[in-house]
Regions:
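Conserved TIR/SEFIR loop-to-helix hotspot centered on a Trp-containing motif
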Residues: 71-91
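A broad detector of the eukaryotic-type serine/threonine protein kinase catalytic domain
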Residues: 67-71, 117
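Glycine-rich, charge-decorated loop segments at or immediately adjacent to ligand/cofactor-binding or catalytic sites
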Residues: 105-117
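Nucleotide phosphate-binding site architecture
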Residues: 46, 74, 118
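Conserved N-terminal substructure of TIR/SEFIR domains
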Residues: 1-68, 87-96, 103, 110, ...
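Conserved beta-strand scaffold positions in the cores of enzyme catalytic domains, especially
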Residues: 98-100, 117-119
Length: 143
């Protein structure tokens, strides 16, 4: 992690299961096991703070925002806001600040489809995808 980021990654996901269970029970523990510092709302958002300000803080304090794509994710205004914040910050700084993994097949909006994302829809391929994701999360956003 570089000095100016508190987190390697802020995970943007839907809380509803199965998304929330997979993120909190499988993805986040795997990232942390690899030594990454992960920001997850349920662990890191301050109690009583305005939610939108906490989203903004998480995006700014993290090297990357990781969108966990699913049909439910794409229907949420909150996750859309997290994406817009990360995309805008990336444009301001000429950096790649938004990454995505496809947890469950879905058709994202055009700006997300224009990005390469990591397919994690096959449980049998989880570990190899996680290795690739961890390596990418260690890179500088301006590379």
């Amino acid at each position: 992690m570089t000095d100016h980021f508190d987190y390697d990654v802020f995970v943007s996901y839907r809380h509803a299961d199965p998304d929330g269970g997979w993120v909190r029970g499988r993805l986040v523990p795997r990232l942390r096991a690899d030594g990454l510092v992960v920001c997850v709302d349920v662990d890191d958002f301050r109690l009583g703070a305005p939610l939108i300000l906490e989203m903004e803080r998480a995006v700014q304090a993290s090297r990357y925002t990781l969108a966990v794509l699913s049909p439910r994710y794409l229907q949420s205004g909150f996750t859309e806001l997290e994406n817009v914040l990360a995309e805008h910050l990336g444009l301001e700084r000429a950096e790649r600040r938004l990454l995505a993994v496809m947890y469950e097949r879905a058709r994202p909006r055009l700006s997300m489809r224009a990005r390469l994302y990591l397919d994690m829809t096959d449980p049998a391929g989880f570990e190899s995808a996680a290795v690739k994701l961890c390596a990418e999360l260690r890179r500088n956003p301006d590379e």
